[in-house]
């Protein structure tokens, strides 16, 4: 059994000498037994209240891919040799990409040179990014999006990628 200390808290107001129910004037200080209740964030409480007040109908619900089971027919979408074009009916926002992997400073310089001279050969570039779960001494990435596979092929045949930067082909959903 855990020990805990108590302290006396003076009662506010005049003292009553009549026949009243006695209230405790002690409160616990320090560790107590049992788990301590955590406060919920206000946003979470408001969201839960809104969900109870305004339940979603099937027509207003949004579909998230993460909550759906894996569709075996769509696993080929990760294959870069996949015959699907951009605008595949099941993935209309899918676009071809190139992930450039290497030294962060080299990637930044290369991205800057691309923006100055080869802007028509790609659609968008990301900032330099890393995987957060890896160690500090890991390589960085820059992702380049294209409007079509032919644009990506033209980019790869035209642009000389500096040594030390690895090119990884793929495609991914575009976020607008």
Swiss-Prot record:
GO cellular component, one term: host cell nucleus
Primary subcellular site in the record, as a coarse category: host cell
One GO-annotated biological process of the protein: regulation of DNA replication
Ranges where the record places region Disordered: 1-70
Subcellular location field: Host nucleus
Annotated keywords: Host nucleus
Superkingdom of this protein's organism: Viruses
Pfam families: PPV_E2_C
InterPro entries xref list: E2/EBNA1_C_sf (IPR035975), Nucleotide-bd_a/b_plait_sf (IPR012677), Papillomavirus_E2_C (IPR000427)
Stated family: Belongs to the papillomaviridae E8^E2C protein family.
Job of this protein: Plays a role in limiting the replication of viral DNA in keratinocytes. Recruits the host NCoR/SMRT complex to viral replication foci to mediate repression of both viral replication and transcription.
The name this protein goes by in its record: Protein E8^E2C
Organism: Human papillomavirus 28
């Amino acid at each position: 059994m855990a020990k805990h200390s108590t302290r006396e808290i003076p009662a506010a107001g005049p003292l009553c000498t009549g026949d009243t129910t006695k209230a405790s004037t002690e409160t616990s200080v320090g560790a107590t037994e049992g788990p301590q209740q955590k406060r919920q964030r206000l946003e979470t409480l408001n969201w839960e209240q809104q969900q109870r007040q305004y339940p979603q109908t099937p027509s207003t619900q949004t579909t998230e891919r993460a909550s759906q089971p894996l569709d075996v027919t769509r696993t080929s979408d990760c294959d870069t040799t996949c015959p699907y074009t951009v605008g595949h009916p099941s993935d209309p926002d899918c676009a071809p990409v190139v992930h450039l992997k290497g030294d962060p400073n080299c990637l930044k310089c290369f991205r800057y040179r691309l923006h100055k001279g080869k802007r028509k050969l790609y659609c968008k570039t990301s900032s330099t990014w890393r995987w957060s779960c890896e160690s500090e001494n890991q390589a960085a990435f820059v992702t380049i999006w294209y409007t079509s596979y032919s644009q990506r092929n033209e980019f790869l045949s035209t642009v000389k990628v500096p040594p030390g930067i690895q090119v990884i082909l793929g495609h991914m959903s575009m976020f607008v």
